[in-house]
């Protein structure tokens, strides 16, 4: 067969490809670039902490005693979904680890996050501030008018924190006023994403249609999702490492 010059692939790999193989790569170039940008990882590498005391009481994987932490008249299990998502991203991509409670304490230290009995959940601005101090390239977005734009963003991202509500669409999430979840590992062949849902131990760590997520984005919120596209160890001001809870 006719050979083409050495071609650089993702992860710094070089190889020589024949014409047919090269054509396959050209056809799937966008998919390969997205995989390279994410970095090589699969479901087994993804952290997916649970927030609730019921999961902890049942001894569920990914649950922890942070669910019973009491903060200003509110239990972590009632408001900790966003912090679980942030801890998931930090522990999956930084080479370090933290618990959701560690993330709570750090967010209180370095951002304007001030939980109250009425509102305990972390807001978008504080989430972005904390993730950037953790070394991540993080940006906030509003829901695009077309699904394809959202899909392309998710495809190329390392991970996404999304805010969903059953008031916008209840195909998947039921009786949910507002809830943060993580999505990652977009699958081109099925148009699905890997879901880390802090409030659903049975639905946690499953693939679901990305369209469900798009339709359920909470549109009354100022923002609907936070995209994480990169990580820099040098920019990580925290370097927390270890999960004690």
Mark where each language-model region is:
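Active-site-adjacent structural segments surrounding the nucleophilic cysteine of cysteine proteases
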Residues: 1-118, 239-245
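Conserved active-site-adjacent core of cysteine acyl-enzyme catalytic domains
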Residues: 5-8, 90-244
């Amino acid at each position: 067969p006719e050979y083409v010059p050495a071609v650089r692939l993702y992860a710094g790999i070089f190889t020589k490809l024949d014409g047919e193989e090269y054509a396959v790569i050209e056809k799937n170039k966008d998919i390969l670039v997205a995989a390279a940008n994410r970095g090589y990882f699969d479901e087994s590498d993804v952290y997916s902490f649970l927030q609730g005391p019921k999961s902890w009481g049942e001894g569920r994987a990914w649950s922890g005693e942070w669910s019973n932490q009491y903060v200003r008249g509110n239990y972590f299990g009632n408001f900790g979904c966003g912090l679980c998502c942030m801890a998931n991203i930090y522990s999956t991509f930084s080479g370090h680890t933290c618990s959701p409670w560690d993330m709570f304490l750090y967010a209180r230290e370095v951002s304007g996050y001030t939980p109250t009995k009425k509102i305990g959940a972390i807001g978008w601005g504080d989430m972005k501030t904390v993730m950037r101090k953790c070394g991540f390239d993080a940006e906030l977005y509003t829901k695009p008018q077309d699904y394809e734009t959202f899909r392309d963003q998710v495809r190329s991202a390392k991970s996404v924190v999304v805010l969903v509500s059953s008031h916008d669409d209840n195909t998947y999430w039921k009786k949910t006023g507002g809830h943060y979840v993580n999505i990652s590992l977009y699958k081109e062949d099925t148009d699905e994403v890997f879901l880390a849902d802090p409030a659903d131990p049975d639905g946690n760590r499953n693939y679901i249609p990305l369209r469900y997520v798009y339709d359920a984005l909470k549109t009354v919120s100022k923002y609907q999702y936070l995209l994480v596209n990169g990580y820099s160890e040098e920019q990580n001001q925290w370097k927390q490492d270890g999960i004690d809870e």
